[in-house]
Amino acid sequence: MSTAVTITAPSVKHILLDSLVVMKIVKHVDSELHAGISEVSGDACAGVLTGLVFLEDSRLEITNCFPTVRNEPVMDDDANAAQQYEEQKQHEMLDMLRKFRTMNIDYEIVGFYQSHQFGAGFSHDLVESMFDYQAMGPENVVLIYDPIKTRQGQLSLRAWRLSTAALDLASKNDWRPELVKAAGLTYQNMFEELPIIIKSSYLNNVLMSELSLAKSCSSDKYSTRHFDLGSKKSLEKSVRAMMANVDELNKSIQSLTKYTIDKQRHDNMVFSLTQKRQQENESRVARGDPTIPMDDIKRIKAPQLQTRNGLLDELLASFDTNALADFSKTVTSENITKMFIAEAVAEEKVAGTKDRTLSSVSSTR
C-alpha cells in the first residue's frame, strides 16, 4: 500500500442502487449466515459491484454485483496458498466480468461490498481494499451490509469511501501520530458516507403502493409481535464488542501517552545537544579549528509508537465503537418505546375489564 498514487478528489455525491443488487447481497449474506460459513472461515461475505459513473449528475449507479471467491482453509506447510487464492480470485472475477460484457450488462467495477454485524467491522485489510479500489477509480465505494439490523426488519446498507486525507496517508502507508495530527484526521472524518437511493422498476413500485394501501390482515390486527423485545442477544453481543474495543483503546491511550513522553524527552535531548554542539563549533571556528559534524546527534534513534500500524488501529477501533454505540442507542430507545406502549395498552385493558365487572355487578342488583 506504499505505492505512489495520484490522488484525485471524487466527484460523486450520491449513489443510485438497483433493487436487484440489494436482493443479491441479502440473499448471498443470508445463505452464508444460515450455513455458518462466515463463522467457520472467519471472513466476511464479500463481492464486487458493477455499474456506471455519471459525472454530470455526480451520481454513481450500481446496477449489478457478484460474490468473490472465499478463501479456503490451507495446510501450514502450503506456502503458495495465498498466491493461488489471489490467482483464482482474479481469474473468476475476470471470467464473470467477461460474461457480463457478453450479456450486455454493465461490467465496469465501481466498488465492492462486505457484510459486518452492527455495521462495525472496519479493519486494516478493509482499508487496504478500499485504497486499492479507489486507486483504481476515485469514484469507487464500499457497501457495508448489516445482517443483524436487516433481520430485525430494517434494511441496513451504507456506502463509504476513504476521505482525501486518509487516502493520502494510506498511499504512504504511514500512520504516525505526527502525520495523522498534521492531516487533521480523526475517526469522524476518516471515512465519507454517501447517501443511497434504491431504485426499483415501475411495476415493483406499483405493487409496493398497492400493498401499502391494502388493508391489514385480520390475523395481524391484534398481534403483539410489534411489541416483541427480540433484540436481547444482539444488544448483548454489541455491548460486549464495544467493551472489547474500549479495552483496546485504553491500551492504545497508554501506549500513546508513553510515546508522547518519550518523544518529548527525545526532542529536548536532541535540542540541548544541538545547542551545545553549535556553541562548541562557534568557539572552534573562532580558534581556527575544524567544526565537529552533527551526525552522531542525528543518529540518535527516535522513540517508536508500540503499535503495528501507527494510529490506524486506534482510528478504526474508535469508528467501530461509535457504530456499536449508535446501534445500542437505537435498539435501547426502540425497546423503551415498546415498553411504554405495552404498559399503556395493558393499563387500558385492565381499566376496561374493571368497568365491565362493575357494570355486570350493578345489573345483577
Curated annotation (Swiss-Prot):
**Keyword annotations:** Cytoplasm, Initiation factor, Protein biosynthesis
Question: What's a Gene Ontology MF term here?
Answer: translation initiation factor activity
* Superkingdom as given in the UniProt entry: Eukaryota
Question: Where is this gene product found?
Answer: Cytoplasm
Q: Which residues form the MPN domain?
A: 15-166
Q: Which family does it belong to?
A: Belongs to the eIF-3 subunit H family.
Q: How does it assemble?
A: Component of the eukaryotic translation initiation factor 3 (eIF-3) complex.
What is this protein's record name? Answer: Eukaryotic translation initiation factor 3 subunit H
Query: Which organism encodes this protein?
Result: Caenorhabditis elegans
Record gene name: eif-3.H
